Structures are given as C-alpha cells and as structure tokens.
C-alpha cells in the first residue's frame, strides 16, 4: 500500500514538473513512479502520457509558427531598411542633402542594426562631411559585423590615412588589397600609407600595381 501511495505521489510530481517545464525532474519522478508501481499498461497513466506528449507536439508546432512569423517580420524590416538606404542615397546624389541622408540611414539602421551597407553609406557621408570620428565609428561597426567586407575595410583605411593613423591605414589597406586585388584605388592608397611610414620601395610597388590595373581597365 505504501508503494502504491508513493507511486501516486511520484506520478503527480512528474506531472507538476512537466507543467513547470522541468523535463529532467519530470523524467526522474516518472521513472521512480514506474519503479514503485509499473503502470504503463494502466489506461490512466497512458492517457496522462499521451496528453503530455500532445502538449509537447502542440508547443513544437506553435514554436515553429512563431519562428516563421519572426523570420517573415525580419525580412519585411530588412526590405524597409533597404528602402530607407536607397532614399538616403538619393538625398546625396540628387538633393545633396546630407542631413536628410543621415536621417534615412539612421532609420534603416533602427530597422536592421546589422545592415552593413547602411553603416558604410552613413560612414562615407560623414567622412565626406569631415566628421571623421563618427565616420570611423560607423566603419568600425561595419568591420566588426563583417571583417571580410571590402567596402568596410577599404573606407576605414581611407579614413585612417586621412586622419594620420598610418599604422591603422596600412593594416586596413593591406587587407583591402587582399580582399579585392583588382581594385586600383586600394593599391594606390596602400602605397600612400606605406610612403607615410617611410617605406618608399613598397609604396612604389603598390603604385605600379595600381597603374597596371588602370591600364588594364582601359583596354
């Protein structure tokens, strides 16, 4: 009788643990209950098991639907962010309105904080406006998000060259020429950075590569 009562307590404890989401405790109590009284063939525990398994399946399906909804929402936000990026670009190319462009880039980033193109475009706009500190922060964010993104690395190197951070410029422009060896501008700026560091021979080599690439492009 004691074992029978103990089994009832353990089955109840297993059910409570399940309801709390503590699967480890649920299984522990369930196996203890089986050890106390083997009830698997009994209709009542079997119904309990089926009901709880049904809840698991329902939750899995709900979780799947929720993930799909979140994915669709994120996709919509990315699309809206892209539209704001395009509007920001138009503010620069057509209206020459830097403030409006930056506002659009900020809207794009509020919708998708990992939107690398928006960070880069914002950085370039700030750089052209001689706001070098904030521009570098934008490029830093872009590089952190995608260390192998050519535009992010190249533009940060260009900025660092402008702000006399020669060592940083050399590191970035060296990487940029590796990421995109056919980019003449990257080789040219890399040469400029090397010259500032007193490396005339290496600088001349990069300038020569840049000239060859420019000639090749004209052909």
Specify the residue positions occupied by each region the protein language model found:
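Position-specific recognition of the canonical hydrophobic site in helix A of tetratricopeptide repeat
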Residues: 18, 92-93, 120, 127, ...
């Amino acid at each position: 009788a004691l074992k029978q009562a103990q089994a009832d307590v353990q089955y109840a404890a297993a059910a409570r643990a399940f309801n709390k989401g503590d699967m480890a405790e649920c299984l522990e109590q369930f196996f203890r209950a089986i050890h106390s009284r083997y009830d698997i063939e009994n209709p009542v525990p079997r119904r309990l098991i089926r009901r709880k398994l049904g809840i698991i399946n329902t939750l899995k399906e709900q979780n799947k639907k929720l993930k799909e909804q979140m994915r669709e929402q994120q996709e919509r936000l990315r699309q809206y962010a892209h539209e704001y990026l395009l509007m920001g670009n138009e503010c620069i190319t057509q209206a020459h309105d830097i403030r409006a462009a930056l506002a659009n880039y900020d809207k794009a980033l509020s919708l998708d904080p990992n939107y690398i193109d928006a960070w880069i475009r914002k950085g370039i706009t700030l750089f052209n406006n001689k706001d070098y500190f904030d521009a570098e922060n934008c490029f830093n964010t872009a590089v952190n998000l995608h260390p192998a993104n050519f535009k992010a690395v190249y533009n940060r190197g260009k900025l660092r060259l402008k702000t006399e951070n020669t060592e940083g410029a050399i590191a970035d422009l060296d990487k940029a020429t590796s990421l995109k060896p056919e980019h003449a501008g990257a080789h040219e700026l890399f040469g400029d950075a090397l010259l500032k560091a007193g490396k005339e021979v290496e600088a001349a080599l990069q300038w020569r590569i840049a000239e060859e690439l420019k000639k090749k492009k004209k052909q």
